[in-house]
A protein has these predicted regions:
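Membrane-embedded alpha-helical bundles of multi-pass transporters/translocases
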Residues: 2-464
């Protein structure tokens, strides 16, 4: 992969490398968007399981995830193969993702209730703690292994999330109708899961072979070439000593709980707005502004002179949008809810496109302060935050539904349940976006790195 030099910056990637990389999140969201948006609905309204028990099982499952995130991140850093460090993990782990995705939506009705809970727990844990972890960390870390150009990293992130949100939009828009067209019931959900798994497997394979990792000597050019050896415990210490890593993890967790609450919108549409087809309309209001923002994120980074200002301004706008959704929701105005939902999504979108570049800066911060390369391990925050946050979010949804007196397979819900749906869909997302805005105000890792580089330069000049 030969680099070009343009405007004093070396370029490592062609346009099709960036697009090919981005398509990998189509495969990732075939798993994640489908699972997070519809598994609770499938389990409660089709299989007939208790949402509170489901939430508890999901929460217990997440106990395995923290260890597996750091484990696979460390394994990626230590991997040497013809495909590179990350691509082998991304390629082969997706086979397991496809199989276990289908298993989550293929719970046999011949099993007893306890066995059905056990089936779900095993399938869900294998998918999240093992296969999706390995695939997702490898995929995220490719941003570091394929280019050293910060603008290209932002562009890769933008393409990634264009595909992610396009896929999420499509799945949220067509799945209910797809299940209905497939005949409804358990068999229909299984058919839909098989179709999505096959599509994901094909696209993931294409993505892996559309991009190449830079040779190790190229990645280490200008840096200390000493062979670095560290175990899982030391890797964990390096991660948790980096305050920006902790901030990114917290942001990811809040984001995923936020997304889980919005994914429960299917219940809000069915029982509050009395029209389940509005779920796809709200998906468009969320995802179309995000896709538009992704296209202009690299330009916005240049215009606003850095990631920090853009991300903070975006989340201030996003929080204001969620406040508007609350007012519109209690007014009962669907058009206003859609408008403010779009404003919120537009404001939060730039972070989705540039977070890969921020994580790369976070990894650089560890190198500048600890003189250790932990690029693959650093990207565990993406998988860790996604799965822990998503797990907490789905579990919380199950617990809140159960506590509210939700009646399975009933067209009419008690007033306590309707009030809880307002809290889940309107209030909790606003509070979470406010928390993320505060974190963003503290996450100026670019400035911290610049100061550290200047300190090192002064030290080197003094020693000379």
């Amino acid at each position: 992969m030969k680099g070009e030099v343009s405007h004093g910056r070396k370029k490592y990637l062609k346009w099709y490398n960036k697009v090919g990389y981005g398509s990998g999140d189509l495969a990732g969201n075939v798993v994640y968007a489908f699972l997070s948006s519809f598994v609770m609905l499938y389990l409660t309204n089709t299989v007939g399981l208790n949402p509170g028990i489901i939430g508890t099982l999901i929460m217990v499952s997440k106990l395995f995830d923290g260890i597996s995130d750091m484990f696979f991140g460390t394994m990626i850093d230590k991997t040497k193969s013809k495909l590179g460090k990350a691509r082998p993990w991304m390629l082969y782990a997706y086979i397991g993702c496809a199989v276990t995705l289908v298993a989550n939506f293929a719970i046999p009705d011949t099993l007893g209730t306890t066995a059905q809970y056990a089936w779900f727990f095993v399938a869900y844990t294998l998918l999240n703690a093992v296969f999706f972890t390995a695939n997702n960390i490898a995929y995220a870390s490719l941003v570091t292994f394929c280019t050293k150009n910060s603008r290209e990293r932002v562009e890769m992130g933008s393409w990634r999330f264009i595909f992610a949100f396009s896929t999420s939009l499509l799945i949220q828009s067509v799945t209910v109708q797809f299940v209905r067209a497939a005949g409804g019931g358990a068999a229909a959900w299984r058919t839909v899961a098989v179709v999505y798994a096959v599509i994901g497997l094909i696209v993931n394979t294409i993505s892996v072979f559309s991009i190449k990792e830079l040779p190790e000597e190229e990645l280490k050019a200008g840096k200390d070439h000493t062979e670095e050896k560290y175990g899982l415990v030391e890797a964990a210490k390096l991660l948790f000593s980096n305050k920006y890593y902790l901030m990114i993890c917290a942001t990811y967790i809040c984001q995923q709980i936020y997304s889980a609450m919005l994914n429960m919108g299917i219940y809000y549409m069915i029982y509050i707005l009395k029209n389940e087809d509005l779920y796809s309309v709200f998906s468009w209001a969320i995802n179309i502004p995000v896709i538009i923002a992704m296209c202009i994120t690299p330009m916005l980074v240049e215009k606003m002179k850095g990631l920090y200002r853009m991300n903070l301004a975006g989340y201030i706008l996003g929080t204001a949008g969620r406040v508007g959704v609350i007012f519109a929701g209690y007014m009962g105005s669907v058009p206003l809810m859609l408008a403010f939902t779009a404003v919120a999504a537009l404001g939060m979108a730039p972070w989705q496109g540039d977070m890969g570049a921020v994580v790369a800066s976070c990894s650089e911060y560890t190198y500048l302060t600890k003189h250790k390369h932990i690029d693959g391990t650093m990207y565990s925050c993406t998988s860790f935050g996604t799965k822990i946050g998503g797990g907490i979010g789905v579990a919380l949804c199950g617990w809140l539904l159960d506590a509210s007196g939700f009646v399975k397979e009933s067209a009419i819900q008690p007033e306590s349940c309707l009030n809880m749906l307002h809290v889940m869909y309107l209030w909790i997302p606003m509070v979470l976006s406010l928390v993320i805005t505060f974190i963003m105000s503290r996450m100026n890792v670019e400035d911290a790195n610049e100061k550290l580089r200047k300190q090192l330069e002064r030290k080197e000049k003094y020693e000379c």
